[in-house]
Amino acid sequence: MKPSRILVLMHETLVPPERLAGFTSQQIEEFRTEYDVVQQLKASGHEVRCIGLGDNLSELTDVIKSWRPHIAFNLAEEFQGLVNRDQHVVSFLELMKLPYTGCNPKGLVLSRDKSLSKQLLVFNGVQTPKFFVFPKGRRIALPEGLGFPLFVKSVSDDASFGIAQASVVHDLIQLQRRVEFIHAQ
């Protein structure tokens, strides 16, 4: 395979060093994924540059225009400190006509809403556990057709954020407390 210029995008605090010497295992763990991806791409013969994304896209714009990468390897999970803005980075890559790895903007937006994602799965015949959304300000009661234990999580938090042992509830009081806790976040 012909070597490519690969631009690796990540959070600005996770840009890995060239070498791990001098770092503690705890420090390395913070940027382990980013380091491993960059090292593997280099070992495969590709030219690699890392961009740490922070609050603006000016450095990304400059590198795309001057270096002209073939593809962006997207490890960015947030933009401007917010996980619900990662789709904007991907939209920008599309506007710049730069191919990228990972999900497209529409997929990122849809996957962020767990309720909508579940509805789409059910609509398309994919078996999924029953679920219920408790709107803020409404009475919290056991939904019809569901029984304990239940797993309670935010409809919008990214990945497993907010999930804890208390997310598994065994009675109505635990359910009410956990839903109220999530609504207060």
Task: Locate each region found by the language model.
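Active-site nucleotide/adenylate-binding loops and adjacent lid/helix of ATP-dependent enzymes
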Residues: 4-10, 64-65, 109-185
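ATP-binding N-terminal substructure of ATP-dependent carboxylate-amine bond-forming enzymes
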Residues: 1-99, 105-106, 111-112, 116, ...
